[in-house]
Amino acid sequence: MDKLQYELQGYLQIDRYRKQRFLYPLLFREYIYALAHDHGLNSSIFYEPTENLGYDNKFSSLIVKRLITRLHQQNHLITSVNYSRFVGPNRSFYSQTIPEGFAGIMEISFSMRLVSSLERIAKYQNLRSIHSIFPFLEDKLSHLSYVSDILIPYPIHLEILLQTLRTRIRDAPSLHLLRCFLHEHHNCNSPITPKKCISIENQRLFLFLYNSHVYECESILVFLRKQSSHLRSISFLAFLERTHFYGKIKHLVVAPRNDSQRTLPLWFFKEPLMHYVRYQGKSIMASRCTNLLMXKWKYYLVNFWQCHFHLWSQPSRIHINELSNHSFYFLGYLSGVRLTPWVIRSQMVENSFMIDTAIKRFDTIVPIFPLIGSLVKAKFCNVSGHPTSKSVWADLSDSDIIARFGWICRNLSHYHSGSSKKHSLCRIKYILRLSCARTLARKHKSTVRAICKRLGSKLLEEFLTEEQEIVSFIFRRTRLHSERIWYLDIIRINGLVPNS
């Protein structure tokens, strides 16, 4: 890995990142394909592990060498006409290997730039966690008025993705090879949608292309943020697939304007309390400004995307709501600002009296029905929420079946530890526990009662976590189900958590 990073530094010239010209020679390096196929790289901060994406675990070094030899023997640039002749009989393997190699090179180049920028932030490892955004929202949203729920539009043509990369990469052979691949495997006249465009074997490449597209769509927000403050936002230097995390900057200095800036709208520069977070294609923009000003932001973004990126975005994809009356769904949580009543006792010299007041409090709960819908899709229960057996796991050993169900249950509990109403998760645990018992009963052709009697406490212990035991010592039993806990080791959303 050190050898690869050393060579990449010579090719990419990180200090001149925007003028990358020498990516194509890396496609002739055998270890590039080995690293791209390696589980350690596939389970990086950008993507899910390979077992979740459905990648084949097989890797043939011999076929990779043949692929590199064919690349060397090409005396002319590959065109979309002879691309099918080039891949030859190993079409499936080459069609997966070439995009994996290209995506791996681009991932490493972006991640090297990411690490170099994040090293200037104290404790930047904590910012990698998805849960790190919720303490920020808890600190800021209680003082704001309106929130915009935004769905970032998809590009209507694959060439838009390539044009986005051309602004950062000037390596013509690499872009030409990528264009040939896209034209060969997809109909470029159809709109890009997650289900239609991203196949399992090429999901990694298209996720990278989509991430670069979203990053460019957010470029206008970078400009406006820098114009509103003298402080440089280091967080925007980071290229992350998850979220852009604002640091908690306490004092913002409004940028002074000279005579040449008088023609620019004032609200571009004099509203520092505009906060923006994103995960994948969904983003949240909150501010203390009026509803009219939020509507201006809405139509400005729609027109900007349509004119600059040729993205067809309808105003209905951006919902503006008042925080005190509406909740928004983000990262598997239903979040909002609630008025919590408080009774304060004031003691005077001789008299004491009670004061009834209400404070704004950021609240997060787990919507149970979307989560049950995910369990239905995964075939753990039916549409009514009744647990069913997982028939595809019936051939596994008893310990593997129990371990798989326990792992899912513990991960869901770990991810939703920030909910203020954890009692709703009891139903999810019940569904998974009974589904596990019915799967074992199906395997042994027995009944659920007999399985539970035979396994006893072993079946229950697998669904309990050490974290629950530790937390029970910290908080009282009455506060255990209402206390929100955010973990800083969650770097990707749980697969069963719906994100829309």
UniProtKB/Swiss-Prot annotation:
The signal sequence is none
Q: Which Pfam families match?
A: Intron_maturas2 (PF01348), MatK_N (PF01824)
The biological process GO terms on file are: mRNA processing; RNA splicing; tRNA processing
Q: Which UniProt keywords apply?
A: Chloroplast, mRNA processing, Plastid, RNA-binding, tRNA processing
Please name the GO terms that the record assigns under molecular function. RNA binding
The protein's superkingdom reads Eukaryota
InterPro entries for this protein: Domain_X (IPR024937), Maturase_MatK (IPR002866), Maturase_MatK_N (IPR024942)
Indicate where this protein resides in the cell: Plastid, Chloroplast
What stretch or stretches form a coiled coil here? none
**Broad class of the protein's primary localization:** plastid
Q: Gene Ontology terms, cellular component aspect?
A: chloroplast
Looking up PANTHER family in the UniProt record yields:
MATURASE K (PTHR34811:SF1)
Q: What HAMAP family does the entry give?
A: MatK
**Functional summary from the UniProt entry:** Usually encoded in the trnK tRNA gene intron. Probably assists in splicing its own and other chloroplast group II introns.
Give the similarity note: Belongs to the intron maturase 2 family. MatK subfamily.
What this protein is called in its record is Maturase K
Native source species: Brasenia schreberi
